[in-house]
Amino acid sequence: HCGQEFYRSKDGLGNTYNTLDHINAVNWSLVDENQEDIETLKQMIQLRKENGGFKYETIQEVNEYVSTNHFDYRILRYCVKQNKGKYQEIVAYFNPSYYDFEINDMDEYEVIYNDHESRTYLAPISMKIFGLKR
């Protein structure tokens, strides 16, 4: 998916493995325009590399160590427990709505990723990730 991080659409084609280079080429002029999102993507890749909980290989592992919850029919809470890594548990909140959400009961957790200043405020169309250290 080369170029995906720059929001290329590959001219709207769904499967481009056999198309010309100009369809699959990275448009480097979009780097500056999307630098903040690129940095976020780098942080998410690093988080995944450092935490085995994002790399479970079997459905049994996923069923045992991963859980999800919905709040107010809008907010998704994704929780991963892991045996290795800096954190014993990682909790991510995703808010795809246009409404604010207050996060509670995370005082013992370290903020891993926060796209807004507040620790407990989840802004519209945002995410926040917490980790419980070992």
List each model region and its residues:
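Solvent-exposed beta-hairpin/edge-strand motifs
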Residues: D105-H116
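C-terminal beta-strand-rich structural cap/linker in extracellular carbohydrate-active enzymes
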Residues: E117-R134
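Loop/helix patches that line or flank the sugar-binding groove of alpha-linked glycan CAZymes
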Residues: H1-M106
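A broad, structure-centric signal for solvent-exposed, well-ordered loop/edge residues
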Residues: E33-Q35, E110, I129
